[in-house]
Amino acid sequence: SAALIDIPIPGPITNTSLQLKSFSQSPVDKSFPPEELFALGSYYYPEQWDSSQWERDLKKMSEMGIKFTHFAEFAWAMMEPEEGKYDFEWLDRAVSLAEKYGLKVIMCTPTPTPPAWLSKKYPDILIQRDNGVSIQHGRRQHASWSSDRYRRYVENIVSCLAMRYGNHPAVIGWQIDNEPGHYGVVDYSENAQLKFRVWLQKKYGTIDKLNDTWGTSFWSETYQDFDQVRLPSQQEVPDKPNPHAMLDLNRFMADELAGFVNMQADILRRHIHKDQWITTNLIPVFNPVDPVRIDHTDFLTYTRYLVTGHNQGIGSQGFRMG
């Protein structure tokens, strides 16, 4: 489930990784006047409730002092129930009701939850664990960032959303995906294997350079061609994988995530009003997350859960507010 509140990360901040690159996006007050920096918002999922309840709920939210709401991040199956057949009338009504009661809307792209027909028709879009098991439809974040086919379907649905709501007066901004990160699961699908080899070739240029950097003369690991390289996996080797390969794996994953988010930001920019901002909400403990690489949004946000997250490795109170 999504968090109650997204808090913009003030910028610029300095990247603390070894990369000689700074993190700099638009100042937060460019999109939010100072008096609105701590506005209270809430996600609302109209697709989960009988439509007769929507007006009651949104009216009560407004009366409670909530200023904005998020829509649509998990609703791809409602928007495109069949391939190429779109239904936005229900979302039009939800946006109109929010506007009626003075609630601003953050529109979200529904890319963490592709519809069942898509993975049924094209199982090659699914991510795969290192034991060879593909992650199936039924929850979320099961489609591969490395799948060109999946990205084409993402482009279609994001373009449709942007063209429909990119100039709506109630829509103040856009959230790309939701907590992108595959829960830290590494994708070992054939799409990811191929993209990893391309990434390595672009980084190192020659296989000799890769061998030298990875220290592959140890244990006769030396490669003669990039096609021989696979994503490092504990399942495929009797001992721990090459640590240099693991480092490149993490960097590759971060680039794939960033490329997926940046691609959507570019699509949105082509259609939305210049006053509508673009963000995504991150979970920092997911391995692929590197905010430095996500640089096509206006700012980044960090999901904080009010009473959970104590077991996520960032301190006993790491996810709590205050």
State what each model feature region is.
Residues 1-3:
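N-terminal export leaders
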Residues 7-70, 81, 96-100, 104:
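N-terminal carbohydrate-binding accessory modules
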Residues 23-28, 52-59, 90-93, 161, ...:
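Alpha-helical scaffolding within the catalytic cores
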Residues 38-42, 69-71, 105-108, 172-176, ...:
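Hydrophobic faces of well-ordered beta-strands that scaffold small-molecule active sites
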Residues 46-47, 72-75, 108-117, 172-181, ...:
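Short, solvent-exposed turn/loop segments enriched in Gly/Ser/Thr/Pro and often Arg
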Residues 50-54, 85-89, 152-156:
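Glycine-rich anion/phosphate-binding loops
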Residues 56-62, 70-134, 162, 264-272:
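Aromatic-lined substrate-binding rim segments of carbohydrate-active enzymes
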Residues 132-299, 303-315:
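Polysaccharide-binding and catalytic clefts of secreted carbohydrate-active enzymes
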